[in-house]
């Protein structure tokens, strides 16, 4: 027989919530902490959980120890996912920074990922502007602006026109 949630300890409720959150997708440690202390929706509207800092630390430590939470795995999956969606290294780094990932972890993962950013930038430009890519200055500037917005580095963008003669 299960206990009603009001009688369960704060730690047990918090651990249950953490596992449900991490079952959906990987999260960074900072994201998980933020979601665990955020109010939950109940039948009566938003309901704040009574979470002590000690309980939060115990739950996060348990998740890390049992490999439910791993920033390195999260970073690798995040880089792969965002690059498949056409985003460049600068944008991915910035988003990971916002998610609370240490710069060293991001740098290491970016070095280890096997992504050809120049060809990915070219694919994005071709998808948006067609083949062949424009060679007129004003049109080239539009392509460059688009790719910079997507997070590609200027040297990768310039490499498109150097390496791939239309």
From Swiss-Prot:
One of its GO terms (biological process) is regulation of DNA repair. The keyword tRNA processing does not apply. GO terms for cellular component: cytoplasm. Gene3D superfamilies: Winged helix-like DNA-binding domain superfamily/Winged helix DNA-binding domain. Keywords: Cytoplasm. It is found in: Cytoplasm. The keyword Ribosomal protein does not apply. InterPro entries: RecX_HTH_1st (IPR053926), RecX_HTH_2nd (IPR053924), RecX_HTH_3rd (IPR053925), Regulatory_RecX (IPR003783), WH-like_DNA-bd_sf (IPR036388). Modulates RecA activity. Belongs to the RecX family. This is Regulatory protein RecX. It comes from Klebsiella pneumoniae subsp. pneumoniae (strain ATCC 700721 / MGH 78578).
